[in-house]
From Swiss-Prot:
Record bears the keyword Disulfide bond: no
GO terms of biological process kind: biosynthetic process; mitochondrial respiratory chain complex I assembly
Reported disease: Mitochondrial complex I deficiency, nuclear type 17: A form of mitochondrial complex I deficiency, the most common biochemical signature of mitochondrial disorders, a group of highly heterogeneous conditions characterized by defective oxidative phosphorylation, which collectively affects 1 in 5-10000 live births. Clinical disorders have variable severity, ranging from lethal neonatal disease to adult-onset neurodegenerative disorders.
Species of the source: Homo sapiens
Gene3D superfamilies reported in the protein's UniProt record: Farnesyl Diphosphate Synthase (1.10.600.10)
Residue span of the annotated presequence: 1-44
Encoding gene (name): NDUFAF6
Coiled-coil annotated residue ranges, if any: none
Name of the protein this chain belongs to: NADH dehydrogenase (ubiquinone) complex I, assembly factor 6
Function: Involved in the assembly of mitochondrial NADH:ubiquinone oxidoreductase complex (complex I) at early stages. May play a role in the biogenesis of complex I subunit MT-ND1.
Length: 333
């Protein structure tokens, strides 16, 4: 089996927390979720979201995140109150960019949308954001926290390059993509939290790379249903696996070995980020709550012996909000 052949990389499970039942964490995340308004986002309300009498641009960002990046939404709820709305805006910006690729039928249209967001970032730093909910909220975040323009532009530029429907040539190319998107998002989150620390940035770099790799793995069944495969070609070739094997949902050992190798790289990034947690300011830990969902996925895929098409991998963990709150309460990542 794939797991038994390579099992030495995987460390002990961390979500089991001995003695936790003896201490009762304060009510927090679930209460916040219940208090949030929840009407559906419609095209009509989106168009009017920044106008008078609408929910408001902040509510639009929150709803977009809740629907399109639920794990990011849950993590954002546990940030300090003064930072929450800015991170909602930042993550909503990322969602807007991420959904361009799947929402257009022609690359030219995707490039036009990316050009809109490039100009939007430029206009935000000229205090002239367009009348668009996410743009307005992002402008507020930039003004409030003096966010670095370079990180925002890196996210747009990398998403634009990724409009080509090509597999990553190697794991390094996937890591570079993750660094310029997910890690950049974390650098900006640290700025919102008021953290300027080399060790925190180092952790953000590795956690962002782990996030990018896990996202690529999780999306494999969806991409396969659209006749697309984006997994690193070098690892596929190493194990003699073709793109057609993934399109046919082949579950042979060599296919699972490909998934094992890729998942192991995410695991190593996560492990390395945690190896120097004592040197990272505690104030930075809330920015890294996504490690909970990353670890949850890596454990699940290990349990199914790296069968990327196993139905259990597509099921939401209903206990994730609780695990996130516990992680926040324990002040760790």
């Amino acid at each position: 089996m794939a797991a038994s052949a390579h099992g030495s990389v995987w460390g002990p499970l961390r979500l089991g927390i001995p003695g936790l039942c003896c201490r009762r964490p304060p009510l927090g995340l679930y209460a916040r979720m219940r208090r949030l308004p929840g009407p559906e986002v419609s095209g009509r309300s989106v168009a009017a979201a920044s106008g008078p009498g609408a929910w408001g641009t902040d509510h639009y960002c929150l709803e977009l995140l809740r629907k399109r990046d639920y794990e990011g939404y849950l993590c954002s709820l546990l940030l300090p109150a003064e930072s929450r709305s800015s991170v909602f805006a930042l993550r909503a910006f990322n969602v807007e960019l991420a959904q361009v690729k799947d929402s257009v039928s022609e690359k030219t249209i995707g490039l036009m949308r990316m050009q809109f967001w490039k100009k939007t970032v430029e206009d935000i730093y000229c205090d002239n954001p367009p009348h668009q909910p996410v743009a307005i909220e992002l402008w507020k975040a930039v003004k409030r926290h003096n966010l670095t323009k370079r990180w925002l532009m890196k996210i747009v530029d990398e998403r634009e390059k990724n409009l080509d429907d090509k597999a990553y040539r190697n794991i390094k190319e996937l890591e570079n993509y993750a660094e310029n998107t997910q890690s950049s998002l974390l650098y900006l989150t640290l700025e919102i939290l008021g953290i300027k620390d080399l060790h925190a940035d180092h952790a953000a770099s590795h956690i962002g790379k782990a996030q990018g790799i896990v996202t690529c793995l999780r999306a494999t069944p969806y991409h396969g249903s659209r006749r697309k495969v984006f997994l690193p070609m070098d690892i596929c070739m190493l194990h003699g696996v073709s793109q057609e094997d993934f399109l046919r949902r082949n579950q042979d050992k060599n296919v699972r070995d490909v998934i094992y190798d890729i998942a192991s790289q995410a695991h190593l990034h996560l492990k390395h980020a945690r190896s120097f947690h004592k040197t990272v300011p505690v104030k930075a830990f809330p920015a890294f709550l996504q490690t909970v969902s990353l670890e949850d996925f890596l454990k699940k895929i290990q349990r199914v012996d790296f069968d990327i098409f196993h139905p259990s991998l597509q099921q939401k963990n209903t206990l994730l909000p609780l695990y996130l709150y516990i992680q926040s309460w324990r002040k760790t990542y």
